[in-house]
Every structure is written in structure tokens, then in C-alpha cells.
Regions:
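Sec-dependent signal peptide cleavage junction
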Residues: 18-26
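Extracytoplasmic "Venus flytrap"
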Residues: 29-50, 55, 66-76, 171-175, ...
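An alpha-beta-alpha
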Residues: 30, 48, 139-189, 285, ...
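Beta-alpha junction/loop-to-helix N-cap segments that form part of ligand/metal-binding clefts
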Residues: 66-129, 224-239, 243-248
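Hydrophobic alpha-helical segments within soluble ligand-binding/sensing domains
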Residues: 121-163, 263-284
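Pocket-lining segment of extracytoplasmic ligand-binding domains
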Residues: 173-245, 249
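Hinge/cleft segment of the Venus flytrap/periplasmic-binding protein
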Residues: 278-341
């Protein structure tokens, strides 16, 4: 009897040890595709990685991250996603609307869950059935832009502004809704506007030259990744011409735009990682996991550009204060990591 009891205890211990080892060895492969190399999207991915590493330490699991960047190339994007499917990743992350849309169409038959990050209009892009109940294998985080809030800041800084440039890439779904909202708002106010577009950096630079030649009073750009990628190439000439550039993300201001308003992309990245954890570790039903939205109402002003425009930062911060939760300064740099150097 004692031998039998000893054998049972030994087996129990062995099974427990095996179970513990299995739990320790639990690993998940996450495929991340970035749309373009810019400060906003890079910050999102950096914070996804950091947050997943924290969770890995807290919960004794491993995340293997496969990351690639299509750099605005649709065929490269499809190849990256095909590779993720072939590698049988446990979950995909699509950073920005075009990547999310392609991931959705390519994974519908696979059952691979997709978490999108920084999609401005998930409903308009046809990614989800509703913001509260996406209804398929995809959900994520949205960087929806309050266009009216940005225009409140434009007219707070310059009540006499009467000629507004709308600078964007018409091919970007992220720009469709905010540009339509901007037109409606300006038409209601009886303020003239003109559209300028570009699909790559060279075209955006030419568009900026046209804005200067047309002597516009201000420029509005939503969360447009094409313009974001070109900001370092246009901010100086706009500032020298005395034309402030108002944009939909703090990363534009980091790269020299006068103002960035909207979502904190570091926070969005961490929230995206938490959604990954909910699906992979906690067993959440992705079809019922609501899209996350953010509204921190922060206006980020580039103090270098502010000075180049001949504006006083303190006066601008005071003018902006009634229209946002906070006003914060930033100086020009290529990436957020450079600010700490």
C-alpha cells in the first residue's frame, strides 16, 4: 500500500512538473506589418513590443514577434502577410488602415485573428460591423481625429485666417473622413480652401511649394501617413513662408509641423498590446471585442517652428488652452527616441 501511495505521489509530482513546464513553455508568434517608416507608427510598434515584454515577464509566456515594413508598397504588403500565413502566426497586427484592410481580406479563410492599430475610421473602411461588436476576426485601436477641434486651434491662433490649404494623400482611407469634415466645416464658415495632394515625398514637396506660391494662411493635414513621411522635407519651407502646419498627430510636430493634435501613440501602442493579450492569453472573442478609441485632447506645439513663424509659445498656449485638455511643447527631431539624447 505504501509503495502504491508512493507511486501515485510520484506520478502526481511528475504530472505537475510537466504541466508547469508546459505553462512555462507557452509561446505565441505575432506578425506585425507596418505601413511606412514614420515616427507615429514606429512609436506604436515600439510600445507594442515593450508592453508584450512586460506581459511575458508577468505571466511566464513568450512572444515571438515577426515584424516587417511594406513602406507604402501594396505588393510588398501582400507578400509580408502571405509569409505570416505560411509561418502560421498566432495573431497578426496591421499598423494603419491599408495594412489592416489587406490583412482582413487575406485572413478571412484562415481564422487567424487580426488586431489593427491606428485605423482612423474602422467602420468607414469596412473593417468592422460596429465599433462595439466588430463581428469577424478583426478588431483593434482607432486614432479617430476630431477635425473640428483642430480647426478651433487654427482660428484661435489666427482669427483672420481666410485661406486654408488641405494637404493629404487622396488614396489614404485615414484622410477621407477628416478631409470631408474639414470641407464641410469651412464651407459652413464661408472660408476658402484649396486641396493639395501627394502620393510620395517628392509630390508632397511640390504640393508644399504650391501652398507657398498660393500664399495660404494655414495648412491642415489629418492622420495621413504619406504626409507624415514627408514632414521632415517640408516643415522648414512652410515655416520660412510664415504658414503654420496643423496636423492630426504629435509625431508631425516632432518632425517640424507647427502643431499636432490628437491621440497619444505610445498609449495607443500599449492598448493594442493589451488587446493582443486579451485574445491570445485570456481567450477573448475577437468578434465581440470592442474597438478602442482615445480622446486625450492634447495639442503638441513645436517650439522651434513656433519661433520660426514669429509666434510666442506662451501666447499660443494661452490661446489654445480653452480648446484642449493640455498644451505641450516639443522640439524638432527625427524620432521620439532622439528627444532623450
Amino acid at each position: 500500500m505504501k509503495k502504491l501511495l508512493s507511486l501515485v505521489l510520484t506520478l502526481a509530482l511528475l504530472l505537475g512538473a510537466c504541466s508547469f513546464a508546459a505553462a512555462e513553455a507557452q509561446s505565441f508568434t505575432v506578425g506585425i506589418c507596418n505601413f511606412v517608416d514614420d515616427a507615429s507608427l514606429n512609436q506604436i510598434i515600439a510600445n507594442i513590443r515593450d508592453r508584450l515584454e512586460e506581459v511575458a515577464q508577468e505571466r511566464g509566456v513568450t512572444f515571438e514577434i515577426k515584424e516587417d515594413n511594406c513602406n507604402l508598397d501594396g505588393s510588398v504588403m501582400q507578400q509580408i502577410i502571405s509569409d505570416f500565413i505560411a509561418d502560421e502566426v498566432d495573431l497578426m497586427v496591421g499598423v494603419a488602415t491599408p495594412v489592416a484592410m489587406t490583412m482582413q481580406s487575406m485572413t478571412e479563410e484562415t481564422g487567424i485573428p487580426v488586431i489593427f492599430a491606428a485605423v482612423s475610421d474602422p467602420l468607414g473602411a469596412g473593417l468592422v460591423a460596429s465599433m462595439d461588436a466588430p463581428g469577424a476576426n478583426i478588431t483593434g485601436t482607432s486614432d479617430y481625429l476630431d477635425t473640428a477641434a483642430v480647426f478651433n486651434l487654427i482660428f484661435a491662433a489666427n482669427p483672420e485666417a481666410s485661406r486654408i490649404a488641405l494637404l493629404y494623400n487622396p488614396a489614404e482611407d485615414a484622410s477621407t473622413a477628416p478631409i470631408a469634415a474639414a470641407k464641410a466645416l469651412l464651407e459652413e464658415k464661408g472660408i476658402a480652401y484649396k486641396e493639395y495632394s501627394g502620393s510620395n515625398i517628392s509630390e508632397v514637396v511640390l504640393a508644399a511649394d504650391a501652398i507657398i506660391a498660393d500664399d495660404m494662411d494655414a495648412v491642415f493635414t489629418p492622420t495621413d501617413n504619406t504626409i507624415m513621411a514627408a514632414e521632415l522635407s517640408i516643415y522648414e519651407k512652410l515655416a520660412e513662408a510664415g504658414i503654420p502646419h496643423y496636423t492630426g498627430a504629435d509625431s508631425f510636430a516632432l518632425n517640424g509641423a507647427f502643431l499636432g493634435y490628437g491621440v497619444d501613440y505610445a498609449n495607443l501602442g500599449r492598448a493594442t498590446a493589451d488587446m493582443i493579450v486579451q485574445v491570445l492569453l485570456d481567450g477573448a472573442d475577437i468578434a465581440a471585442l470592442p474597438v478602442m478609441t482615445f480622446d486625450n485632447g492634447t495639442a503638441t506645439v513645436n517650439t522651434d517652428t513656433c519661433a520660426a513663424l514669429g509666434l510666442d509659445y506662451d501666447a499660443i498656449a494661452e490661446a489654445f488652452a480653452p480648446f484642449c485638455t493640455q498644451v505641450q511643447p516639443i522640439t524638432t527631431a527625427e524620432s521620439f527616441d532622439d528627444l532623450g539624447e
